[in-house]
Design a protein with these regions (language model features):
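Catalytic active-site module of serine/aspartate enzymes centered on a nucleophile-bearing elbow/loop
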Residues: 356-358, 362-398
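Conserved acidic catalytic loop of the alpha/beta-hydrolase fold
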Residues: 140-146, 153-173, 182
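Short beta-strand/loop motif that positions the catalytic acidic residue
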Residues: 334, 340-342
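Catalytic-loop region of hydrolases
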Residues: 1-58, 67-72
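Short alpha-helix in the alpha/beta-hydrolase fold that links the catalytic acid
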Residues: 321-327, 350-360
């Protein structure tokens, strides 16, 4: 099994296609329901070894998709690399590049000369995997808000069913940032015998109360938009774009640090040397930037998927789910070696969460390494500080 690739530049996996697989069995969910006819969107990079033992699963964050590396064969109108400094980082290639292209490829952190890297769009997504915008086989209409509430465990359960359908039963590693790191931790606990190593980056064993609050505000911005229509806006010609844009603005600010915003924008005015005394138009460059981010995000992402992904990551709590409220008890079944990477300026997923998890693993005699990288960009560092993460991951996977 190999990826479909062409036009390969040095260090690149080339041009790739997103493919699709329908799970052969209904998928049971934590909420007690099950999903029939689950489709998974995925991409692969590198070559599967004859023993099928060189597989790395990379897991995306809230707004990602299956296109993690290379150039999309059919680029979307808006790419997933639309965050902080995207234009200066990617230039005209941004809409076609995978969201973690700097980390996946020959000689990169997840070296496709050694590993067969798999990326899926998460259950509940809007980029090819079954989610709220998919057709409910029982009604013939989009699920909308009738889609069942899902958890990170459900996402991982879908990934495992997908990999089993490909004939893959062992993973050399599971890696991801933010929500992706939560999936890696879930894999290590739920399917520990299947996973040799995990790499949770800028992640946590449970989101802190401030993170819960920011996610709640973003979700409320969406459902307060009249065009949300109770979640059944598909086919009406309207969508909750205003609420979704505000949710993106809120989320985007939580991904950045105060110093990053100060360095890039300060208090620079948008289009003049003095204020224009306009109530509604952006006066400051940072206001214009947030509006640009909101408009781009609305064009590529589904509001209901945002609601479901946000809810899933707020439910995630290893201690509550697996340890009766004690993290030390929750992680006792982990056998995979663990590399934790955190960033000094990340206040949404602060280093303290990774430090607490590392201490629990260490006290339980588990193999764990923790690296806190001093970097100024906040939570988005896991997408921006690729060069500094690469040697840590390469050494860990050797």
């Amino acid at each position: 099994m190999t990826m479909r690739a062409s036009r390969r530049a040095p260090g690149s996996v080339g041009t790739v296609e997103t493919r699709f697989l329908d799970l052969p069995e209904p998928l049971p969910l934590d909420c007690g329901r099950e999903l029939r006819s689950v489709r998974m969107a995925y991409e692969t990079y590198g070559q599967l070894s004859p023993a099928r033992d060189n597989v790395i699963l990379v897991c995306h964050a809230l707004s990602g998709d299956a296109h993690a590396a290379g150039m999309a064969s059919t680029p979307a109108s808006e790419g997933t690399r639309d965050g902080f400094r995207a234009d200066e980082r990617d230039g005209s290639l941004g809409k076609a590049l995978g969201w973690w292209d700097g980390m996946i490829g020959p000689g990169k952190a997840f070296d496709t000369d050694r590993f067969f890297v798999v990326s899926t769009n998460l259950l509940g997504g809007c980029r090819g995997t079954t989610g709220p915008s998919s057709i409910d086989p029982d009604t013939g209409r989009p699920y909308g808000s009738d889609f069942p509430v899902i958890t990170v465990a459900d996402m991982v359960r879908a990934q495992r069913a997908f990999l089993t359908s490909l004939g893959i039963t062992q993973l050399a590693a599971v890696a991801g940032g933010s929500l992706g790191g939560m999936q890696a931790l879930e894999w290590a606990i739920r399917y520990g015998d299947d996973v040799k190593a995990i790499v949770p980056i800028a992640s946590t064993h449970a989101l802190h109360p401030q993170g819960l609050a920011w996610n709640a505000i973003a979700r409320n911005a969406i459902v307060a938009d009249p065009d949300w229509q109770g979640g059944h806006y598909y086919g009406t010609g309207k969508a909750p774009n205003a609420g979704m844009g505000i949710a993106r603005m809120i989320g985007h600010i939580t991904y950045l640090s105060a110093s990053a915003l100060q360095t890039k924008f300060g208090r620079q005015l948008q289009s003049s040397d003095d204020v224009r005394y306009r109530l509604m138009e952006p006066e400051f460059q940072v206001e214009s930037y947030l509006r640009y981010q909101a408009d781009a995000f609305v064009r590529r992402f589904d509001a209901n998927t945002y609601l479901y992904m946000s809810r899933a990551l707020t439910y995630f709590d290893l201690a509550r789910q697996y340890g009766g409220g004690r993290l030390a008890d929750a992680i006792r079944t982990i056998s995979a070696k663990t590399l934790l990477i955190a960033f000094s300026s990340d206040w949404l997923y602060p280093p303290s969460g990774s430090e607490e998890l590392a201490a629990a693993l260490r006290d339980a005699g588990k193999p764990v390494s923790l690296h806190v990288i001093d970097a100024p960009y906040g939570h988005d560092c896991f997408l921006l500080e690729e060069a500094r993460q690469t040697p840590l991951i390469q050494a860990f996977l050797d």
